[in-house]
């Protein structure tokens, strides 16, 4: 089991630099102990997929936290407090596990294999070094925890299921289907306009999350082709779709081919570039592009209840997650996270794990592997019809080919 004494020191150390507002002291039945954190970490790593190693003796390297401005429900005091929402448990030679810091919240909020995050005084630091999708998904986890502690009055029953046979669902997972985590920078942005803004890479604007997500989708739907809208590939698509990261395009022909494909998709869907080096496009137009290219064999629905079922039932079943412009400034301010300003962010969901009855979707963010991982799906804040104080205004498009479509 995880080294207790070292972990206890780290847990207290993560709050040594206290912010100005005092930490709220609430009912002890909501307190998350080190033993609870240990159980949550072990549960998060149970039945790992996608090549994550199975840790027999996971050892914690560091524990950090995110806090939010907080006022207890029905409080008549004017004092503002700080509430710890999430623990970020970094393992030695392992992933970072996001664990709820209050038992009204969920035990597990995420498993991030390659996270490189910095914290201080309960805040996420160096946010300008994180792409918008990464901040978005971390903010989604923190918002979910905040919603739980402010809208519920009893402990979440999933804490009692940690490391129990009843809590395990060995059939509740789907291996990811998209092999790539290319990102939006070099070489995909080779043909983007010149830019010196914060989102530029090597002097070029970002390739854009929507065309990159569409190119990623093609790696699932198309095994090979030699001509892409009149452009003759110098290498085969079969090779390109197996270049798992943007650093794996070593040959000039490969770099040029993938840049042309992503750039042409951007042109076809009317992508525009902003002064800061970011790119803006509409996923709706992207779906029309995909449908045309796949010979009208593409089908999709927008039913949140079908996301995991579509992945299981259909060989090409994946989901594009669309996040519109966020207007919930007060929520992001409370979380201390910079609100993503892009008009639309497109993320690929192509796998999932179920932990104690909760579903964590694998998010391929389109901005590199450090932003990818499993994130807890919370229907109270993800969906566009979610309650306004915590809503993230997300929409899903569950994609499949009409040739392999199965009724659920």
What do the predicted segments below correspond to?
Residues 95, 105-139, 301-306, 312-408:
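Active-site signature of cysteine proteases
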Residues 10-13:
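C-terminal motif of bacterial Sec signal peptides marking the signal peptidase cleavage site
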Residues 23-43:
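Post-signal peptide N-terminal segment of mature Sec-exported envelope proteins
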Residues 53-103:
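Exposed beta-strand-loop-beta-strand "reactive/processing" segments of non-cytosolic proteins
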């Amino acid at each position: 089991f995880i080294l207790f004494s070292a972990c206890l020191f780290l847990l207290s150390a993560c709050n040594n630099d206290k912010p100005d507002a005092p930490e709220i002291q609430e009912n002890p039945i909501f307190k998350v102990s080190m033993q609870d954190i240990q159980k949550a970490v072990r549960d998060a790593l149970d039945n790992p997929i996608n090549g994550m190693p199975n840790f027999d003796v996971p050892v914690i390297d560091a524990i950090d936290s995110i806090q939010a401005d907080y006022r207890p429900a029905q409080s008549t005091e004017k004092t503002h407090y700080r509430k710890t929402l999430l623990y970020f448990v970094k393992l030695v030679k392992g992933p970072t596990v996001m664990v709820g810091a209050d038992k009204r919240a969920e035990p597990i909020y995420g498993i991030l294999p390659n996270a490189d995050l910095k914290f201080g005084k309960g805040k996420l630091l160096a946010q300008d070094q994180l792409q918008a999708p990464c901040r978005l998904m971390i903010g989604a986890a923190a918002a979910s925890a905040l919603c739980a502690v402010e809208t519920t009055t009893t402990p979440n029953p999933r804490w009692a299921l940690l490391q129990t046979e009843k809590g395990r669902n060995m059939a509740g997972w789907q291996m990811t289907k998209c092999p790539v985590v290319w990102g939006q920078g070099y070489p995909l942005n080779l043909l983007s306009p010149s830019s010196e803004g914060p989102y530029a890479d090597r002097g070029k604007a970002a390739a854009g999350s929507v065309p990159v997500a569409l190119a990623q989708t093609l790696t699932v739907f198309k095994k090979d082709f030699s001509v892409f809208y009149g452009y003759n590939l110098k290498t085969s698509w079969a090779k390109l779709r197996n270049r798992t990261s943007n650093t794996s395009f070593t040959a000039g022909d490969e770099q040029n081919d993938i840049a042309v494909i992503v750039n042409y998709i951007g042109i076809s869907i009317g992508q525009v570039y902003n002064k800061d080096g970011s790119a803006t496009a509409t996923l709706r137009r992207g779906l029309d592009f995909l449908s045309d290219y796949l010979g009208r064999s593409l089908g999709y629905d927008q039913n949140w209840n079908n996301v995991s079922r579509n992945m299981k039932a259909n060989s090409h079943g994946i989901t594009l997650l669309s996040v519109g412009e966020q207007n919930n400034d007060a929520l992001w301010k409370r979380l201390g996270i910079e609100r993503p300003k892009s008009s639309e962010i497109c993320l690929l969901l192509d796998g999932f794990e179920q932990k104690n009855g909760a579903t964590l979707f694998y998010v391929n963010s389109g901005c590199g592997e450090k932003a990818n991982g499993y994130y807890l799906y919370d229907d109270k804040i993800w969906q566009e019809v979610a309650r306004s104080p915590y809503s993230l205004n997300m929409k899903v498009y569950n994609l499949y080919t009409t040739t392999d479509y199965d009724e659920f």
